[in-house]
Amino acid sequence: MIYYGTMFDHKVRFSIVRMREVVEEARNRHVLSYLATVVLGRALIGAALVTPWLAEKERWTLDIEGSGPIRRVVAQSTSEFTVRGYVANPKVELPLNEKGKFDVAGAIGQGVLRVVRDLGLKTPFVSQVPLVSGEIAEDLAYYFAVSEQIPSAFSIGVLVDSGGVKIAGGFAVQIIDRTLEQEKVELIERNIKNLPYITELFQKAEPLDVLERIFGEKVGFVETAEIRYKCDCNREKAKNALLVLDKKELEDMRKEGKGEVVCKWCNTKYVFSEEELEELLKFKVDNSGS
C-alpha cells in the first residue's frame, strides 16, 4: 500500500510505501538470490514511490548500470500504480558489508542512473546522472536534485532471509516550493537524519506514524493506492519477438522442435511448437520477398 499527499501548504509532497508482497513476487518470478532480491526490491520501491507524481498514462523507468557483478537493475512504474523489473545477474551474492548489511553498493559498483519518462509521445525524456553511492535511495535523491531541481530525500529498505521477504518499503519527501520556511526545511532534514533504518522502522511503526515523525506533526489528507506487480507481456508480443530473428535462427528452433521466449520483466515463458515456428517462417518468407 502506498500513502501520499502534501504538507505545509502543498510546498512539500511525500509518498510512503510498504510492498513486501510485491518484492516477494519479484523474488519468486525471477528466482533471485538474497542480494539480488534486495537490489531489485530497492529499485522497485524507488519506482513505486514516484507513481503518485506521474502524468496520466506515464511510464517511468529507473535504469541503473554499474561495474559491479549485478551489472544492471531496471525497474519500471506506471501512473496506474504498477511496477515491474529485472536484474542482469539474478544469482549474485557477496559477503555482507562492514555494517553487516547486504552489499548493494558492491553489487552495483560505479556507474550511472538513467531515468526514462515515457509520456506516450514520439520520444521519451531521458536523464542520466552518475551514481553517488550505489545504494539506490541516495542515487534517486541526487537524480531529482540535479536533473529535476527538486530537493528530495529517499529512504528505501528490504529485509530478506531464508523464509523470503520480511519487510520492504520506503519513503520519499520532496520540496516542490522553494518558499518553504528554512526552519521547516531544517526540521524535516533533522527528523529524517534521526530515523533508524526503514526496515527497523517498519517493524514497529505504521506508515502514518513514520510521516508524523518526519514532519513533526500529524499529516492531514492522505491518499492511498495498492501497488501491484504487473507486466504487459503476452503471447502475441512474444511471437513478434521471434519474427525479429533471422530465418536461420527460426529454422534452427524448428529443427529442435520448439522455440521459447522468456519475458525479461516477469520471467514468463512462451513456448512455440514446431508447427507454430513453421507458420512464423512462412510468414517471414512471404513478407520479406525472399
Curated annotation (Swiss-Prot):
A Pfam family that the UniProt record links to this protein: HSP33
Report the NCBIfam families cross-referenced here.
PRK00114.1
Per UniProt, which keywords does this protein have? Chaperone, Cytoplasm, Disulfide bond, Redox-active center, Zinc
Q: Give the UniProt family note.
A: Belongs to the HSP33 family.
Q: Annotated Gene Ontology MF terms?
A: protein folding chaperone; unfolded protein binding
In the record, biological process GO terms are: protein refolding
Gene3D superfamilies reported in the protein's UniProt record: Hsp33 domain, HSP33 redox switch-like
Name of the gene:
hslO
Supply the SUPFAM superfamilies for this chain.
Hsp33 domain, HSP33 redox switch-like
Compartments annotated for it: namely: Cytoplasm
Q: What does this protein do?
A: Redox regulated molecular chaperone. Protects both thermally unfolding and oxidatively damaged proteins from irreversible aggregation. Plays an important role in the bacterial defense system toward oxidative stress.
GO cellular component entries = cytoplasm
The PTM entry states: Under oxidizing conditions two disulfide bonds are formed involving the reactive cysteines. Under reducing conditions zinc is bound to the reactive cysteines and the protein is inactive.
Which PANTHER family is this protein grouped with?
Answer: 33 KDA CHAPERONIN (PTHR30111:SF1)
Name of the featured protein:
33 kDa chaperonin
Cystine links in this protein are 231-233, 263-266
Organism's domain of life? Bacteria
